[in-house]
Amino acid sequence: GWINEEKIQKKIDEP
């Protein structure tokens, strides 16, 4: 769990 983890997960969810 780092800070960018949330942003990366969102990028994977919606292109």
Curated annotation (Swiss-Prot):
- Which keywords does the record carry? Antibiotic, Antimicrobial, Disulfide bond, Secreted, Toxin
Q: How is it modified after translation?
A: Contains 3 disulfide bonds.
Q: Where in the cell is it found?
A: Secreted
Tissues/organs with expression: Expressed by the venom gland.
The organism's place on the tree of life at top rank? Eukaryota
* Keyword Nucleus set for record: no
The UniProt GO MF terms for this protein read: toxin activity
Q: What is this protein called?
A: Scorpine-like
**Source organism lineage?**
Eukaryota, Metazoa, Ecdysozoa, Arthropoda, Chelicerata
